[in-house]
Amino acid sequence: MSLMVVSMACVGLFLVQRAGPHMGGQDKPFLSAWPSAVVPRGGHVTLRCHYRHRFNNFMLYKEDRIHIPIFHGRIFQESFNMSPVTTAHAGNYTCRGSHPHSPTGWSAPSNPVVIMVTGNHRKPSLLAHPGPLVKSGERVILQCWSDIMFEHFFLHKEGISKDPSRLVGQIHDGVSKANFSIGPMMLALAGTYRCYGSVTHTPYQLSAPSDPLDIVVTGPYEKPSLSAQPGPKVQAGESVTLSCSSRSSYDMYHLSREGGAHERRLPAVRKVNRTFQADFPLGPATHGGTYRCFGSFRHSPYEWSDPSDPLLVSVTGNPSSSWPSPTEPSSKSGNPRHLHILIGTSVVIILFILLLFFLLHLWCSNKKNAAVMDQEPAGNRTANSEDSDEQDPEEVTYAQLDHCVFTQRKITRPSQRPKTPPTDTILYTELPNAKPRSKVVSCP
């Protein structure tokens, strides 16, 4: 009797195991994408279907049932490589596996994996508020925004295969944006982030990635010390070097400046006094600024020490109040765009001054000519005193003689020459015995 019971139990267990695959039982496999489910257009991704018992074969299924030719009617072994990836590959995937002892029986569908293809729109921008250096236990807001009206934004951290975080975009002041809250900050959340945007009708076709943003957690290690050589107060043009040091065996030091968007890093060097130090040359001093430094280890590049005490570097003999970041060019080099604007403005001002001078000169000339032409032709009029001033140093007096014949030159001013020849002829002669500037008039 007992033998019969045991036999029936074994048969029942066998039937349950046989029915499981056909009925879509609990033998659910696990589908993963490597290296990431976020794939640039033209890139590659490998889909793998895992199960606690090794599958001989598996099949892929796409949620939207848009058949890609390479999928149709094919059975794959272990993994499937998509390359090159196109927008047609974007979508939601599942897999089913077959059992070695049951080639016709398939497992239940796996977990879904969403393949997102990037590079279909212009990249958005990614910012950290209040900043990318976050103290352990605090929170940071990563804001993704664009002037393209994206309906959804995605935030993805490098090195992880899980689906990116997704938020609905909010439109404000002509831009679309989403705020991703990260925290409480810990080492697992630190790393390099990028964000993407998408529109409603193609939710799995994303924009190009934003520029990478490194989020660093600070505070796990003791702070280093920061000093300035030759000192924190220097004359304008004097060279300055900032030294970051500690007795902790840091592999790397990082120098940051308040208000600066970037940091500068240098490897630590062991000194004879058993300290580890890095010297940051800043070059000739032109401005002032407040600096801090951090230490980090090679095995954990996104985990930094507490910041050093702030060091204020001031420059005497220079009215400027802030010093450019070590990674930013000196202000003396100028901004090429601003330089072009300055040159263009100067040229316009010079041309305006020249035009104004020309118009003023033309106006004065016309006014002078009009005054001369308005004078009545007086027969009993002396020559203009200005004519006498333009002659030789010896003053000469002219007399107007009517109907006299002399061998002197005939003078007719071009500005007073009438269009029709006059009937009378006026001759001028020099009178050497006349008094200077006197006027002798001969009446007819």
UniProtKB/Swiss-Prot annotation:
Disulfide bonds join 49-95, 144-195, 244-293. Residues 22-340 are extracellular. Residues 42-102, 137-202, 237-300 form the Ig-like C2-type domain. This is Killer cell immunoglobulin-like receptor 3DL1. The chain crosses the membrane at residues 341-360. GO terms for molecular function: HLA-B specific inhibitory MHC class I receptor activity; molecular adaptor activity. The keyword Cell membrane applies. Ig-like C2-type domain 2 mediates specificity through recognition of the Bw4 epitope. The gene is KIR3DL1. Residues 319-333 have a biased composition (Low complexity). Belongs to the immunoglobulin superfamily. One of its GO terms (biological process) is natural killer cell mediated cytotoxicity. Glycans are attached at residues 92, 179, 273. Gene3D superfamilies: Immunoglobulins (2.60.40.10). It comes from the Eukaryota. Residues 1-21 form the signal peptide. Residues 361-444 are cytoplasmic. The keyword Iron does not apply. Pfam families: ig. The lineage of its organism: Eukaryota, Metazoa, Chordata, Craniata, Vertebrata. Keywords: Cell membrane, Disulfide bond, Glycoprotein, Immunoglobulin domain, Membrane, Receptor, Repeat, Signal, Transmembrane, Transmembrane helix.
